[in-house]
């Protein structure tokens, strides 16, 4: 799906074209971290053989404390040793009885329980804008949100910012070093936001493409995207408040081709000894409603069970809109219950296969039906927190102008949708 629309930037005199936020249009349709003292019950399926969520608890040699008896692991990258810990412990090979990764810096991570969503936040768009002008000019074609703007969302109760950006700007040439200026913008935002206790979800907003060439093709082999992620993971592996989102909305490719690329990228991330949580999308714009459908090829629900994370710390990211074709281009929502309905099959898949999910994009205009649909959707996610880890609204950011889904405040005034989200931020 393509959600392109004109926008107004305060720093730019003319109207510009925004980069497309994503979505999951389906042609078959007609119409932050949790603290060490978290005491929620462990999800039975969350083991090292399925989709666990491990959040960093302590750095090498540091002491830590857990409430009750919890599963803690010690290591780095893909090398770990697990231990059931009651009370206090220390992030050392002596305490865990083994050095799983000799010669590298290690951390201790806590296996997260269920019952409370880990992340609730918003995509702050801007750095992915101007996709027709790559790499483009900063301040004219695209903009990073300011770290200060995140304070508004934090004060509302959000603890996660999803940051869309373009691969081509960060790495203008495949397999080569990152552009210093773009890297500075990216790391500056991430470091400032995570320093306040927020989590940042990195989102290469490229639809599984680089200058229009699909990942897994001869022009953009899997090894090139693996190189990108190896470099990016190295930048942020010491920051446990950074989540690595593999890609925004892969589409129009064999699902098997996307799986191959995703597995290559996961291997590259873990080879950099990065222990961060990784969010993995599916094919077909990673639509929740179409996860088990075959109109785009072999269903995600079949193929993505072949995912292989050597670090055993992944979450599946899906997107879901509420209009007739799930594209997120309409102000109308199908019904007050459509959001929960469209998440149902994916939720069953998560639970049946021992995985966890994150609702990485959803949004709607402000009207009675849509407000009810959003509320029912978020209630559904909350009530299924044994497999759901959280959500991020699409979108906020400085250049949206009158975009119907935007929750960026206008002159300090909340957008109407914020009142719908507010009960789920307590």
UniProtKB/Swiss-Prot annotation:
One of its GO terms (cellular component) is plasma membrane. Transmembrane segments: none annotated. This is Endoglucanase. InterPro entries: Glyco_hydro_5 (IPR001547), Glyco_hydro_5_CS (IPR018087), Glycoside_hydrolase_SF (IPR017853). The lineage of its organism: Bacteria, Pseudomonadati, Pseudomonadota, Betaproteobacteria, Burkholderiales. Its EC number is 3.2.1.4. PANTHER family: ENDO-BETA-1,4-GLUCANASE A, GLYCOSIDE HYDROLASE FAMILY 5 DOMAIN-CONTAINING PROTEIN. A lipid is attached at residue 20 (S-diacylglycerol cysteine). A lipid is attached at residue 20 (N-palmitoyl cysteine). It is a lipid-anchor. Residues 20-45 form a propeptide. GO terms for biological process: cellulose catabolic process. Residues 1-19 form the signal peptide.
């Amino acid at each position: 799906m393509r959600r392109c629309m004109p926008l107004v930037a305060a720093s730019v005199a003319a109207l510009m074209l925004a980069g497309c936020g994503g979505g999951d249009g389906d042609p078959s349709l007609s119409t932050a971290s949790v603290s060490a003292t978290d005491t929620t019950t462990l999800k039975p399926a969350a083991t090292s053989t399925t989709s666990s969520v491990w959040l960093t608890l302590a750095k090498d040699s540091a002491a830590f404390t857990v409430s009750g008896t919890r599963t803690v692991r010690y290591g780095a990258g893909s090398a770990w040793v697990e231990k059931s810990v009651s009370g206090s412990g220390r992030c050392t090979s002596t305490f865990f009885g083994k050095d799983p990764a000799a010669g590298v810096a290690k951390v201790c991570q806590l296996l997260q329980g269920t019952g409370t969503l880990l992340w609730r936040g918003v995509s702050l768009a801007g750095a992915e804008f101007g996709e027709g002008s790559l790499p483009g000019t900063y301040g004219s074609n695209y903009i990073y949100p300011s770290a200060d703007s995140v304070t508004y969302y934090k004060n509302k109760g959000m603890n996660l910012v999803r940051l869309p950006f373009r691969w081509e700007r960060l790495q203008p040439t495949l397999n080569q070093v990152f552009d210093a200026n773009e890297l500075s913008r990216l790391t500056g935002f991430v470091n400032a936001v995570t320093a306040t206790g927020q989590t940042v979800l990195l989102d290469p907003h490229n639809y599984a493409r680089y200058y229009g060439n699909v990942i897994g093709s001869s022009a953009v082999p899997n090894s090139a995207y693996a190189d990108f992620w190896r470099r990016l993971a190295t930048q942020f592996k010491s920051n446990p408040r950074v989540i690595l989102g593999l890609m925004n909305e892969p589409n129009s490719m064999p699902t098997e081709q996307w799986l191959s690329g995703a597995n290559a990228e996961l291997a590259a991330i873990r080879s950099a000894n990065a222990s961060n949580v990784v969010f993995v999308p599916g094919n077909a714009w990673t639509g929740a409603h179409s996860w088990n459908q075959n109109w785009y090829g072999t269903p995600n629900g079949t193929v993505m069970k072949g995912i292989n994370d050597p670090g055993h710390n992944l979450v599946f990211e899906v997107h879901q809109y509420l209009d007739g074709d799930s594209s997120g281009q309409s102000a109308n929502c199908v019904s007050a219950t459509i959001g929960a309905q469209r998440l149902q099959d994916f939720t069953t898949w998560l639970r049946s296969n021992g995985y966890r999910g994150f609702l990485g994009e959803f949004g709607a205009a402000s009207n009675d039906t849509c407000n009810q649909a959003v509320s029912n959707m978020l209630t559904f996610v909350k009530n299924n927190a044994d497999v759901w880890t959280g959500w991020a609204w699409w979108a906020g950011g400085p250049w949206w102008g009158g975009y119907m889904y935007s929750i960026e405040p206008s002159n300090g005034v909340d957008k109407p949708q914020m009142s719908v989200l507010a009960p789920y931020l307590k």
